[in-house]
Amino acid sequence: MRYIGSKKLLLPEIKKMVDKHTDGSEEVFLDLFAGTNVVANYFKQFYTVYSNDMLFFSYVNAKATIENNSKPSFSKLIQAGISSPMTYLQNLEVNDETIGYYEVAYSPTGEANYLSVHNAKKLDIIRSQIESWKNQNLLTEHEYYYLLSSLIEALPFISNTTGTYGAFLKHWDKRSLNDLELQDFTIFDNSKQNKAFNEDANELVQKIKADIVYIDTPYNSRQYASNYHLLENVARNEHPTLKGITKIFDWKNLKSDYATKGKALVAMRDLIQNINSTHIILSYNNEGIISEEDLTNILKEFSVDGIVDIKKIPYRKYQSKNVSKNKEIYELLFYIQRKPFSKNKTLNKPLNNVRVSSTKKYIKSPLNYIGGKYKLLNQILPLFPKNINTFVDIFSGGANVGINVKAKKYIFNDMNTRINEMFRYFQTQPPVKLVQQIEEKIDEWGLSKTNEDAFLAFRKHYNTNPNPLDLYVLSSFSYNYQFRFNNSMEFNNPFGRNRSHFSENMRNNLLNFVTKLQTLDATFTDNYFNEFDFSNLTSNDFIYLDPPYLITTGSYNDGKRGFSDWNNTSEMKLLNFMDYLNQHGIRFALSNVTEHKGKTNQLLKDWAYSRNLNVNYLDHNYNNSSHNSKSKGSQEVLITNYETKTFNLLNTK
């Protein structure tokens, strides 16, 4: 979610400040002004975390992702016959004749353009259903907040605004015409009693204590309640009367003193004075309401040793878009020791028992691999045999398919050794630690979606000393997030300006993928497909093949996806290979296209027909997942040498 003052890009600096002054004995981390819980969620891997915010929609998110430690089971809903609540909510049908509160409030039905009429109707019916389940006692507390936060997180992606809700756009932005899609969360289980609060920060600090307190108050006169009133209204669901063109509720009780000149300094002094903690870290900005000098004086007054550690970070380093270089704008990080303690320094490491879970039906590869089958999984996987002993993905690529298959043993094979080296590295790293390594590398090199010089320097560094971690980081800032190499196996994909970066979605996909991967008995091999040794495979095993497509023009990640070229000769080798599998009674499934942009793969069609194979037609136009390229008029197929209902081998010719 785009959020004013989000500290996502500042996390490495905050972590450095914490590590500099703590000794590893600290247990509780309090985020007093949590917002979207970016900081709280990051530090959950190290500490028991308390999250607080005066806005209720922030509290909802904290209940779902901070206080909650596990993937919701939805056991009562399942008993009631609803196997997947997220899917159920997503598929609820809107009634054109029914006009709900949110439709009148935020759509053209009520003369507002925040949401399309369809999405506002969808919001009404989903919000109502979640509340109904709660009232029927079909949801636990955390299940309720999980579903509600999933809905709230979805709204910015289809809102007709510039990012906040101070006003809506006169003309409809393209993204606002997309359908509302509920957002899944990745949940960290740190086995701690984390807590979420929804209180005034100045009052809360007088009631609780923590070892580390992080403060990120508003800097300027923009009030968060008015800028995010739509999300707050949906979270509270009290249906208040709305006023004015902007359709805002009476938010006076949510007005922050920290965004009010004349009150901010007094409020800050009161806050610091009453905090019961050993360490205080404060984020601010040198153009904020409170001057740097005044902040320093307050902190010095309440520092146990009179010392204030100040770190100035150039503002443009942590922005997604460039700001004028003539502006001397800084993010400020202040640290004071509030109470005395005996420092016995130990390395602050992620908790060993942090676990990751998600409610997503399918795990998505952390790689954007051209030709990936993630969007086809719901059609492909039901056609795969059950009770697979060894699953072999012979053109594994980004491993979207294999990671979602149920089997006893897995072999992922691909010619691209660099990709396989990366996956082998992922197998050895704790998921949370892996993300931390990536974020530290990004910070070390100053990588961002606007800093091309840093990208080029890092690419040169990688090509001099290639390693799997750097390759993944490099791809995260590359054009279309892709992996491309020249004939010397040097990475040569250009910079992905203004788009490519290590996003929250990438982070969650990586965490979920690596967590799942490390539960599998999986091996990664680097063979050409017809050199793969399948002598130990039996009829209880299964081979999936997703080769380059003969009649499409997709340029694969390494130029030719590890192949010098894919032509009729390559296709014949593939068909002969599958004939050999067939003769040895090994079940296989082949993904391919028989038609594409007026072209026909007659070779493949004739081969499948002559062997009496099962051709399953999939409801999907071939799309190579490129941001700038969409193909039409394709027929995607899954060809199997077994019956897809009984999974028995066919009587092939």
Swiss-Prot record:
Pfam families: MethyltransfD12. Its EC number is 2.1.1.72. It catalyses: a 2'-deoxyadenosine in DNA + S-adenosyl-L-methionine = an N(6)-methyl-2'-deoxyadenosine in DNA + S-adenosyl-L-homocysteine + H(+). PROSITE patterns: N6_MTASE. GO terms for biological process: DNA restriction-modification system; methylation; mismatch repair. Keywords: DNA-binding, Methyltransferase, Repeat, Restriction system, S-adenosyl-L-methionine, Transferase. It is an enzyme of class 2 (transferase). Signal peptide: none annotated. InterPro entries: Ade-mod_methylase_MStsI (IPR012186), Ade_MeTrfase_dom_2 (IPR023095), DNA_methylase_N6_adenine_CS (IPR002052), MeTrfase_D12 (IPR012327), SAM-dependent_MTases_sf (IPR029063). GO terms for molecular function: S-adenosyl-L-methionine binding; sequence-specific DNA binding; site-specific DNA-methyltransferase (adenine-specific) activity. The keyword Repeat applies. Monomer. An alpha subtype methylase that recognizes the double-stranded sequence 5'-GGATG-3' in one strand and 3'-CATCC-5' in the other, methylates A of both strands, and protects the DNA from cleavage by the StsI endonuclease. The 2 domains of the protein participate in modification of the two strands. Belongs to the N(4)/N(6)-methyltransferase family. This is Modification methylase StsI. It comes from Streptococcus sanguinis.
